[in-house]
């Protein structure tokens, strides 16, 4: 019998409604197969660091340059996080204060640009990110944005277009990276183009930072002037972000983060980032990164064998983008049916998608979270089979038959997940 104290005992006594909802979310994360590629599980150590008294302390400024007293221990924690980031990624400078990925990217704009300046990024429907200048984002409203995409024949970044647009539009900043890129990003090719047009190259590695740290994706260091990343995806840290750069941009970035955009940093998050970075420096993390990529390759291979159309024909990293057009269904109904069946992924636009963003042609899935639970090739093949079953049932349009498939698969998923510990949650 587990005699460990209930970690939510105080919360249950104060606010049982919230405590019950947290427990329900814990069960959901344990019982489902989580394939959203931007999600993961943090370790118990990271969870513990996040929920500490560090949240009580205001710390405007930077280590040894604060506006409030009582920073003796906060300064040490933030300095440790900075030094670990510099060591892990091999960079000159790191800022660990950005609240999340979008504020981190906005700090880059504030540091380098004036309103109306031209920026260039991957078009959102092609796999880019809102903050790379997409029109509905502040970055596309306050700045002049131009986009590049992928080749229609290969689904890979069209470097001829990147070069052509860069030469024609002369952007001051070029973003390399995105949210739905299943292939290796050629940072050297981006750097060559950026140098030609005298642009600052920003590598947004939010999705792949853990793969870079684990040595299974080429690093942008030495190619990019600035590197932006979240800490909560493949890096397995808390919800936060980091900006890394050469010394040339260090002061401008620090000033843009504080006082430009933010006040006091979230010290509890900074501590958890430090813990996650230490975990990422261990040999086991390199094994984890390799297993993410290996699992994605098996999952992609099995989906291809079952007749699914994968954007770019496969994957080199953690992410798979599936165009369901050939299956006769759209992404949203398949994603929702799979969720009811215990498999969580997201509907997503695919390159050159004729459908609307809220009802797109594709689904996006990845392997970071299932790999964190210790799943391997056999489980990837089973997951592909379940995805195929549910997709086929959706395509047939028989709601009663679909409900039966969903119910059966959900039960099978629950049985499978019992065999794999849930990081941070199993007590």
Swiss-Prot record:
Q: What is its EC number?
A: 2.1.2.1
Write out the residues that bind (6S)-5,6,7,8-tetrahydrofolate. 124, 128-130
Substrates-to-products reaction catalysed: (6R)-5,10-methylene-5,6,7,8-tetrahydrofolate + glycine + H2O = (6S)-5,6,7,8-tetrahydrofolate + L-serine
Site label Plays an important role in substrate specificity, positions: 232
A Gene Ontology cellular component where this protein is annotated is: cytosol
Cite the annotated pathway: One-carbon metabolism; tetrahydrofolate interconversion; Amino-acid biosynthesis; glycine biosynthesis; glycine from L-serine: step 1/1
Return the broad EC class: transferase
- Sample GO molecular function, one term: glycine hydroxymethyltransferase activity
Q: Which UniProt keywords are listed?
A: Amino-acid biosynthesis, Cytoplasm, One-carbon metabolism, Pyridoxal phosphate, Transferase
One of the protein's GO biological processes: glycine biosynthetic process from serine
Any signal peptide, and if so, which residues? none
Name any cofactors this protein relies on: pyridoxal 5'-phosphate
Q: Main location per UniProt?
A: cytoplasm
Fetch the Gene3D superfamilies from UniProt.
Aspartate Aminotransferase, domain 1, Type I PLP-dependent aspartate aminotransferase-like (Major domain)
Residue numbers bearing the N6-(pyridoxal phosphate)lysine modification? 233
Q: Name one Pfam family in it.
A: SHMT
Which InterPro entries does UniProt cross-reference here? PyrdxlP-dep_Trfase, PyrdxlP-dep_Trfase_major, PyrdxlP-dep_Trfase_small, Ser_HO-MeTrfase, Ser_HO-MeTrfase-like, Ser_HO-MeTrfase_PLP_BS, SHMT-like_dom
Cellular location of this protein?
Answer: Cytoplasm
**NCBIfam families named among the record's database cross-references:** PRK00011.1
The role this protein plays is: Catalyzes the reversible interconversion of serine and glycine with tetrahydrofolate (THF) serving as the one-carbon carrier. This reaction serves as the major source of one-carbon groups required for the biosynthesis of purines, thymidylate, methionine, and other important biomolecules. Also exhibits THF-independent aldolase activity toward beta-hydroxyamino acids, producing glycine and aldehydes, via a retro-aldol mechanism.
- Report quaternary structure and partners: Homodimer.
Family of the protein in this entry: Belongs to the SHMT family.
Task: Report what the protein is called.
Answer: Serine hydroxymethyltransferase
Question: Which species is listed as the source?
Answer: Acidothermus cellulolyticus (strain ATCC 43068 / DSM 8971 / 11B)
Gene encoding the protein: glyA
């Amino acid at each position: 019998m587990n005699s460990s104290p209930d970690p939510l005992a105080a919360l249950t006594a104060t606010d049982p409604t919230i405590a019950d909802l947290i427990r329900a979310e814990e069960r959901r994360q344990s019982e489902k197969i989580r394939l959203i590629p931007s999600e993961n599980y943090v370790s118990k150590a990271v969870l513990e660091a996040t929920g500490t008294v560090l949240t009580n302390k205001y710390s405007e400024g930077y280590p040894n340059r604060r506006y409030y007293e009582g920073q003796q221990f906060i300064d040490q924690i933030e300095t440790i996080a900075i030094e670990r980031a510099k060591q892990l990624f091999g960079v000159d400078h790191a800022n660990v204060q950005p609240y999340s990925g979008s504020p981190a990217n906005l700090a880059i704009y504030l540091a380098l640009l004036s309103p109306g300046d031209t920026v260039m990024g991957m078009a959102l429907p092609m796999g880019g990110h809102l903050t790379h200048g997409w029109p509905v984002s502040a970055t596309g409203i306050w700045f002049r944005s131009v986009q590049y995409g992928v080749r229609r024949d290969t689904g890979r970044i069209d470097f001829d277009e990147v070069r052509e647009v860069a030469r024609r539009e002369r952007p001051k900043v070029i973003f390399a990276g995105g949210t739905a890129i299943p292939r290796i990003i050629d940072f050297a090719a981006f750097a060559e183009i950026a140098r030609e047009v005298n642009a600052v190259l920003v590598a947004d590695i939010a999705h792949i930072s853990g793969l870079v740290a684990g040595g299974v994706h080429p690093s942008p260091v030495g190619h990019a002037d600035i590197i932006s990343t979240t800490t909560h995806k493949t890096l397995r840290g808390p919800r936060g972000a980091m900006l890394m750069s050469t010394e040339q941009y260090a002061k401008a970035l620090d000033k843009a983060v504080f006082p430009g955009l933010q006040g006091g940093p979230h010290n509890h998050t900074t501590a958890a980032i430090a813990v996650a970075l230490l975990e990422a420096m261990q040999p086991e993390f390199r094994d984890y990164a390799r297993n993410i990529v290996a699992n994605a390759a098996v999952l992609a291979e099995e989906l291809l064998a079952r007749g699914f159309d994968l954007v770019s024909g496969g994957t080199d990293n953690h992410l798979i983008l599936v165009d369901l057009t050939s299956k006769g269904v759209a992404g949203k109904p398949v994603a929702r049916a799979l969720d009811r069946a215990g498999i969580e992924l997201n509907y997503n636009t695919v390159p050159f998608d004729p459908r609307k963003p809220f009802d797109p042609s594709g689904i996006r899935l990845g392997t970071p979270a299932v790999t964190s639970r210790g799943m391997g090739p056999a489980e990837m093949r089973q997951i592909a089979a379940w995805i195929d079953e549910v997709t086929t049932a959706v395509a047939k349009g028989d709601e009663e038959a679909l409900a039966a498939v969903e119910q059966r698969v959900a039960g099978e998923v629950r049985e499978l997940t019992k065999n794999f510990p849930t990081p941070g949650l199993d007590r």
